[in-house]
């Protein structure tokens, strides 16, 4: 009924929000690692 439709939407929205946040965290880690690697390559400290 109406409740199950609403519940499904709410769960889907939460899941999408969670996935986006996880993606952001992982993305930031990848970017940071990339910057670290680029920095050590420039300095020749790898």
Curated annotation (Swiss-Prot):
Q: Tell me the compartments it is located in.
A: Secreted
Tissue expression summary: Expressed by the skin glands.
**Key word rRNA processing present:** no
Where does this protein chiefly localize?
A: secreted
What keywords would UniProt list here? Answer: Amphibian defense peptide, Antibiotic, Antimicrobial, Disulfide bond, Secreted
Query: Cellular component GO terms, alphabetically?
Result: extracellular region
Detail the disulphide connectivity of this chain as listed in its UniProt entry.
40-46
A GO biological-process term? defense response to bacterium
What does the function comment of this entry state?
Answer: Has antibacterial activity against the Gram-positive bacterium S.aureus ATCC 25923 (MIC=12 uM) and the Gram-negative bacterium E.coli ATCC 25726 (MIC=12 uM).
UniProt family annotation: Belongs to the frog skin active peptide (FSAP) family. Esculentin subfamily.
Under what name is this protein listed?
Esculentin-1HSa
């Amino acid at each position: 009924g109406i409740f199950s439709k609403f519940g499904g939407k709410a769960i889907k929205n939460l899941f999408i929000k969670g996935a986006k946040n996880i993606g952001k965290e992982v993305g930031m880690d990848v970017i940071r690692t990339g910057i670290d690697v680029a920095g050590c390559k420039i300095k020749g400290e790898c």
